[in-house]
Curated annotation (Swiss-Prot):
Its main location: cytoplasm. The gene is PEX5. Coiled coil: none annotated. Belongs to the peroxisomal targeting signal receptor family. GO terms for biological process: protein import into peroxisome matrix, docking. Receptor that mediates peroxisomal import of proteins containing a C-terminal PTS1-type tripeptide peroxisomal targeting signal (SKL-type). Binds to cargo proteins containing a PTS1 peroxisomal targeting signal in the cytosol, and translocates them into the peroxisome matrix by passing through the PEX13-PEX14 docking complex along with cargo proteins. PEX5 receptor is then retrotranslocated into the cytosol, leading to release of bound cargo in the peroxisome matrix, and reset for a subsequent peroxisome import cycle. It is found in: Cytoplasm, Cytosol; Peroxisome matrix. There is a cross-link at residue 5 (Glycyl cysteine thioester (Cys-Gly) (interchain with G-Cter in ubiquitin)). Residues 6-28 are annotated as: Amphipathic helix 1 (AH1). This is Peroxisomal targeting signal receptor.
Amino acid sequence: MSADCSVGANPLAQLNKRVQQDRTLQHGSHVNIHQGAEAQAFKSGPQVSESNKFQMEQFMAGKASSGGNMFMGAGMSSGPLALGGSSGLRMSPGPAKELGARLGGAPMTGSWSQEFNQQVGSPVQSSSAVSSVSMSSASSSVARAGAYRPMNMMRPVMGLQGARAVGVERHAGPAINDAAWEQQFQELEKQVEKTLNISDPVEQQQVLEELSAEAREADYAGGDYEKRFQQIWNDIHDQTDDLDSRTELGGGSGDYQRVFSTRPAQTAQYAFETDNQYLHNTDAYKIGCILMENGAKLSEAALAFEAAVQQDPGHVDAWLRLGLVQTQNEKELSGINALEQCLKADPHNLMALMTVAISYINEGYDVSAFTMLGRWLETKYPAFVEEPLDRVDRYNLSRLIIEQYLRVANALPEVDPDVQLGLGILFYANEDFDKTIDCFRAALAVRPDDECMWNRLGASLANSNRSEEAIQAYHRAIQLKPTFVRARYNLAVSSMNIGCYREAAEHLLTALSMHEVEGVAMAPGSGNVPSSNILETLKRAFIAMDRRDLLERVVPNMDLQQFRGEFNF
């Protein structure tokens, strides 16, 4: 398997994903399921608690509480990110050992699969566990700027427990007399007026007008304001169209349409490299396989597979390998497009289903990821799937699929690393990183030389603020596959987490050098353009090094030779 975890920080893309969430009831696919603590705690439906009703009543009356805070998930931060709150969330014996014990007749007492079932039946407990997120400030601006996502995501985490506590406390406390409230407000108003000396309404208006004029001048002082705003707006609009095209998938077999969406639509088109030396080579697919086996650059292997699918658009294996290569090459969207084309031709391709599920998690399309994971299990172990996924509402989808994976894991005579992978992805999406780590380690016990699994383990460790352990996992992945661009990129981010900015820059420059293919120009809009994630992270590394002179050199298609005199890569 080769879908991998990665780190990216594209603010426009993140804003677009927030816009995408508002349309979940329309498409039911390619949306982020993490819309609040309730969703993460597997609540069975859009239920409203009494405290939330009370807060809504306060809001409608103009007395909304500000107790609820929303934080951007910052796995790159040096501060603790505690998603559990109790050690009970850990799988203490480990999945492999636990599975063996269960198969030998041992009860499930103390296992996290039993804990999961208990949490599903206890909304209050689950909500509390999720809402116990704590986050300290990062040690540098770089740490705050970059952030891990569930496998590639900066997901907003709703701290709703604080809001609930405030709401309950106010509801339970003695009612405040209206007259007393008005008196306190007037006293506070007088104190502010006295302190700021703005009691004169005419003077207040003059101050506001002056501030407004200064603000307008400041807005326009930086250059062509309208042009820059229009450019940003156009980028947001274009990315929204791109997500819509991916949401409205279809046009293939009935199974394919059922997995993606009930609406007839078209799969997003893959952007091919125009300068391709293998385009007229009839053995392009074989050449691509040889390049991968011999450790060639992933970008070069991608060119061979691109040529193969252009020669034969129905070549399932070529589309599959192209998707695998691009996800490893830190080109997620190109990988998703290729994998979707593979599934359009073969909806039951197990490797494509699992790989695209991880890529969907990376891009924030959790509902589609859960659907793909359910489809994978339904295809490989149909006897364990009791309820068709098309009859399950999206709020119960994650819980149901986790239960199905646990049922399979408990019943198998030996550990299936792919089942552990799927289970780990599900926990990863719900930010249960301790369980994710145990699942990935159980898979590595069976497949110790799986470089992609080592990379996924590293991403999970990094999200648990265990950067040193993550770095070891990434090094193991790179040792197994030196051309693994995504692992190098993740290694750079973890290096930045511990303050090793120079080393991070060298890892990023190495990754960029692997995107270069001899004799191939990197044309804008082609699939061979270096990852913007790598370029942006390199800029942050140079900023952390206080090297503004180097920052100015970081542009698309830059000549990497200018950095070789100072950096080893």
